[in-house]
Amino acid sequence: MNFTLFSGTSEQPRLPQDPSAEPFELKAVAGPDIWRTPSSAGGRDDFSGPIYATPLSLDSFKRAQVTISANFQAPYSQGGLILFMPESDPTVDADGQSLRLHESLSTWIKAGIELVDDQLFASIAAGKPYSDWSLTRLGENTATFEMEKKNGSLWIYVVGSDGNRTPLRKLTWVFDMKPQRDVWVGVAACMPKGDGTANGGSFAVQFRDFGITTE
């Protein structure tokens, strides 16, 4: 599988060609997010957070998992798995090192850890076309998240420090989609609010034990 960085920052550390073989880190700066709402709920349309992902056919997807850890300080700082469906082919960014999409995507799912009201949650958001969002109290800054195709639906699980695998969400519509292009599966990091410093600071998310299974 060939992995590609989307919307990378100048502070981004080296990323491994095979992210399943070694731990790695994504760096986010203040501002970019992955979130979409109608005008009645604020009118945001944003798909600009850094992502490290690989393309594959939706029919072939079976499972993705990763262990996430970070020093969550800024409101809504987040990191986790992502699956998204581009409507057009991405192009090389001006830095020549990453890809960029021409439009804010209408179909995506992200699952990871997020800081909300000074507490850590397992956070699931899905856009189709607007974002919905669910939170489950986690209380720790390290956890493993899994996306799995099961009986035609996408299930999302979290595994905490106690080793228990807890189902968080069942999305029944994902594999009913008929995308004209490959979907992309990988990891993302965002810090939409900044950390209160003059330039908003930066936020690093560590990922390990990353893997994708196809069928």
Explain the meaning of each model-derived region.
Residues 1-215:
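Extracellular glycan-recognition regions
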